[in-house]
Amino acid sequence: KEGYLVNHSTGCKYECYKLGDNDYCLRECKQQYGKGAGGYCYAFGCWCTHLYEQAVVWPLPKKTCN
């Protein structure tokens, strides 16, 4: 599974500005989804890869980004 890293309290994607390989996104994806996860910056949001099937990613149901 893959998807955008989401802030559970705001419903917003984690923003990033350095597209492609991005240490911030990689670190945040691993912190939220485990050390097997990967991450990079895609379309100014942190995109996480190698997630478990039940991983919660953006968009959150009934939670829009405020």
UniProtKB/Swiss-Prot annotation:
Entry keyword set: Amidation, Disulfide bond, Ion channel impairing toxin, Neurotoxin, Secreted, Toxin, Voltage-gated sodium channel impairing toxin
Domain LCN-type CS-alpha/beta: residue ranges: 1-66
Swiss-Prot/TrEMBL GO biological process terms: defense response
Primary subcellular site in the record, as a coarse category: secreted
Residue numbers of Asparagine amide PTMs: 66
Tissue specificity as recorded in UniProt: Expressed by the venom gland.
Family annotation (PROSITE patterns): LCN_CSAB
Intracellular or extracellular location(s): Secreted
GO annotations of cellular component type: extracellular region
SMART domains documented for this protein: Knot1
InterPro entries: LCN-type_CS_alpha_beta_dom, Scorpion_toxin-like, Scorpion_toxin-like_sf, Scorpion_toxinL
Entry superkingdom: Eukaryota
Disulfide partners: 12-65, 16-41, 25-46, 29-48
Domain remark text: Has the structural arrangement of an alpha-helix connected to antiparallel beta-sheets by disulfide bonds (CS-alpha/beta).
Family that this chain belongs to: Belongs to the long (4 C-C) scorpion toxin superfamily. Sodium channel inhibitor family. Beta subfamily.
Function: Beta toxins bind voltage-independently at site-4 of sodium channels and shift the voltage of activation toward more negative potentials thereby affecting sodium channel activation and promoting spontaneous and repetitive firing. Is active on the human voltage-gated sodium channel Nav1.6/SCN8A when tested at 200 nM. In vivo, is toxic to mice when intraperitoneally injected.
Note: Negative results: does not modify the currents of the human voltage-gated sodium channels Nav1.1/SCN1A, Nav1.2/SCN2A, Nav1.3/SCN3A, Nav1.4/SCN4A, Nav1.5/SCN5A and Nav1.7/SCN9A.
Protein name, as recorded: Beta-toxin Cbo1
Organism: Centruroides bonito (Scorpion)
